[in-house]
Curated annotation (Swiss-Prot):
UniProt keyword annotations, A-Z: ATP-binding, Chloroplast, Disulfide bond, Fatty acid biosynthesis, Fatty acid metabolism, Lipid biosynthesis, Lipid metabolism, Membrane, Metal-binding, Nucleotide-binding, Plastid, Plastid inner membrane, Transferase, Zinc, Zinc-finger
Family: Belongs to the AccD/PCCB family.
Full protein name: Acetyl-coenzyme A carboxylase carboxyl transferase subunit beta, chloroplastic
Primary gene name: accD
UniProt-reported outcome of changing residue 252 to A: Complete loss of carboxyltransferase activity in E.coli
Amino acid sequence: MINEDPSSLTDMDNNIDSWKNNSENSSYSHADSLADVSNIDNLLSDKIFSIRDSNSNIYDIYYAYDTNDTNITKYKWTNNINRCIESYLRSQICEDIDFNSDICDKVQRTIIILIRSTNDTNDISDTNDISDTNDTNDTNAIYDPFDISDTNDTNEIYDPFFILDINDTNDTNDIYGIYDPDDIYETNIKDICERYSEIYPRNREKSTFVPIDYSDPNCMEKLARLWVQCETCYGLNFKQFFRPKMNICEHCGEHLKMSSSDRIDLLIDRDTWNPMDEDMVSVDPIKFDSIKELGSEEESSKDRLDEDMLSPDPIELDSEEESSKDRVDSEEEKDQSYIDRLDSYQEKTGLPETVQTGTDQREEIHPLFEDIMNQLDLYLQTAKNRVDSEEEKDQSYIDRLDSYQEKTGLPEAVQTGTGQLNGIPLALAVMDSEFIAGSMGCVVGEKITRLIEYATNLLLPLIIVCASGGARMQEGSLSLMQMAKISSALYNYQINQKLFYVAILTSPTTGGVTASFGMLGDIIIAEPNATIAFAGKRVIEQLLNKEVPEGSQSADLLFDRGLLDAVVPRHLLKEFLTELFQFHGFVPLT
């Protein structure tokens, strides 16, 4: 079917095999004949028309033929159209194809743009047509945009960077919509690896492509809005697809950090999560900021006392006039340049001429010395700025709590509640390493303890997902006490009530969490390559001044040593837990 003048249409044959007499087989034998070749001149102007195959699949095509020779045969017409259809059905996407016909003369140029499919492309018969091996005997009749083996025609270019013109709305005669043929890029560049700006110099002002300036100090912040960098292979993962892939690097398969909310969505069935103790927030129980200020005041007073004890006796000082003169001389020396200071010291010391540095030598040394001094000044300024930025980050404990609550949207470093895992009711606690490194303070310990007691009373299985740097130092010994409190609640849950507790260790799990409830599970599961240790790598290296071997704190090594029961990839975790609970007698409610 062609949206053209009715006089150009002829009786359609539902089989295009009649055009296969020219020692070539069609690459798509189930398409309808488009037009009688005798009326082909009517289609030489730029037009959009529709084609329909025998399966009632309709496609809109823009076809333009720029040539000095109007002697077009059935063979040329059929081959171009069939290659166009074949390419579309292979890609199954709206894709623009701009190629030089390798069958026509070199002066002829064919432009075919597949605009859209006007019906459902999920028809099974379409895929059957594509996979029909009987129609692919002649590989020359198939245009595959991903096939680079055909190097006979060096002018054939597949254009993967076509940019839609969505700004061209002034032309009232524009019948092509956003696919304006006036904006089709003309290029004879044969190297498809050339830079974007060299391939498309014509429409660069209209392009929505925004180059990235890596010299911009905010460059990485801009990239972080769209990309997540893997900590292992440093590959970039597009944020839009990162969460559906469960925060697993698409390049190396590394399991990157995951928020507590995402883990709840991963494990708990939809609309079954019931959070607990959401209104419980941390305070400053030991007045950590007051102790810090008191300590700084004591240090300053001690320094002042030491200075007073070490200060010289005023009697031993020179006269006030000489001391003021020395101060003036020292200030003048600081303002002098290097050459002037050399001259002044030579005049002051009275050194002979043979010892003094020659004028020529000083002129040669002076630029090098000035350059070194400028570099030192730049380094000192950079260090000063770094110190200033660190001082800005040195917030009080209460301010840090507020900033992390605003950043993560969580009141504390753990979420607790009940839900269903494939229909099995359970109690769940998930720690979040983004909230002050997932550190365990009084509120974290209290929420986990309350959850364990609630699960004990209702005889629910328990899962705790650990992701923590250990006890929170801002709360002192009160944070260390949470280790014993949680362990005591687990003793009653596991030993007295004989209930089932599963610990899931993610990266990082260190410090007091590892030394308490992290390693008390009836079944201990870890994610691949998770960092699990009592003391972190940096702490060990600073304390013992020894380098920690690579991989010595990974979950895979601990599994080999028998400290873990299983290492389960993230995408298999829910099904693994379901089978584990069913094996221990827990059945779904439905």
